[in-house]
Amino acid sequence: MQFDESDARVWIWFEIRREDDIVELLWQSGQVVGTNQTHRQSYDPPPILRGSGSGRGEENAPLSQPPPHLHQQNLFIQEGEMYSWLHHSYRQNYFCSELLNSTPATHPQSSISLAPRQTIATRRAENFMNFSWLRGNIFTGGRVDEAGPSFSVVRESMQVGSNTTPPSSSATESCVIPATEGTASRVSGTLAAHDLGRKGKAVAVEAAGTPSSGVCKAETEPVQIQPATESKLKAREETHGTEEARGSTSRKRSRTAEMHNLAERRRREKINEKMKTLQQLIPRCNKSTKVSTLDDAIEYVKSLQSQIQGMMSPMMNAGNTQQFMPHMAMDMNRPPPFIPFPGTSFPMPAQMAGVGPSYPAPRYPFPNIQTFDPSRVRLPSPQPNPVSNQPQFPAYMNPYSQFAGPHQLQQPPPPPFQGQTTSQLSSGQASSSKEPEDQENQPTA
């Protein structure tokens, strides 16, 4: 590979993995000069003035500039060293073997250029409190150098830790950085510091890529800080509201409990009144507990039920007893009839002369006694006769017959004695016919 001075500049870009710097090698009058691409164009930003709201009379005083950054010294390589380095074999694995492209022999080129990597601008937010150059006073002016594009820093003029906020705290200053050659993208950063009272400072940096302009401008809105009295009032109102809600729920619960207790008390009073009435109805009930009183009531009801069942059994046969009830009152005081038997001797009147006046004994005609003929006796039929079931002797009545069972009442009574009734009738007729004859035969005085 041969290089002539008449050829154009040969730009050889390569990346060194050390501190993220880019070094540019230039061919100038037979020598290779290495310069840092980051600090190729140095510029001095305009002085940043303090805000008008500081109140210390330093409205137009510029901020103090930080000490200039120490640039790396240019790397000078002698011509002999450059020649040995360029004509070295590519077979060895050097750190730049992957960066340099091999040129074909048939088509030599006058210049070789390696395009740098294009970084994609991304929107990100970083906290610059982690860097050492921001640990000091944030109001000190200075130029912020980065490995790639430059940043514009905007600061507010306020004092750290101050309790008073200046009236123009929301206004911020902006700096304009002119565009430089060879840069494809610009990144403008905005540093905004808000006054947060006693809680300290919050620093936020927003980096955004702008394609063609290098102007950065920050506009911040004032933070509305509520006083302590308002926060206390709100806290009291919230606590008061919660207490009222709790009080309302507790009142409702107490009210429902009172209603339940009142209903329970009324129910118990009614039960006690009913138990007292039950004790009065049950004889010899002196129990104090409700269970014992109920047991006595159950026993008493059972006894009454058994008595009623015993009284209802004769009432079922009341239709049969009513048929002979009128005959029971007839001839109840009549003595049994006197039946004279034949062959009996009566006392003579002579034997009773000393006792009283003698009266002739009445002569009773006796009917002819017929011999007993069993053929004339009629036997009762085997079928029961409902008329024969009725008693034929109303003069003799068993007083316990009404309590007898139905099977006892259905027994047939003994057959009547027919000879006795006929003799009574004949004797009655004879006595009535002899009375006038006796009156005629009596002597007259």
UniProtKB/Swiss-Prot annotation:
Keyword presence, Transcription regulation: yes
Biased composition (Basic and acidic residues): 231-246
CDD domains: bHLH_AtPIF_like
Record's keyword terms, sorted: DNA-binding, Nucleus, Transcription, Transcription regulation
PROSITE patterns registered for this protein in UniProt: BHLH (PS50888)
Annotated Low complexity bias: 418-433
Annotated localization: Nucleus
UniProt key word Transcription: yes
Positions of region (Disordered): 36-70, 224-260, 365-445
InterPro entries on file: bHLH_ALC-like_plant, bHLH_dom, HLH_DNA-bd_sf, PIF1-like_bHLH
Stored Pfam families: HLH
Entry's Gene Ontology cellular component terms: nucleus
Domain bHLH residues, every copy: 255-304
Record GO terms (molecular function): DNA binding; DNA-binding transcription factor activity; protein dimerization activity
SMART domains according to UniProt: HLH
GO BP annotations, alphabetical order: regulation of DNA-templated transcription
Quaternary data: Homodimer.
Name of this chain's protein: Putative transcription factor bHLH056
Organism: Arabidopsis thaliana (Mouse-ear cress)
The gene coding this protein: BHLH56
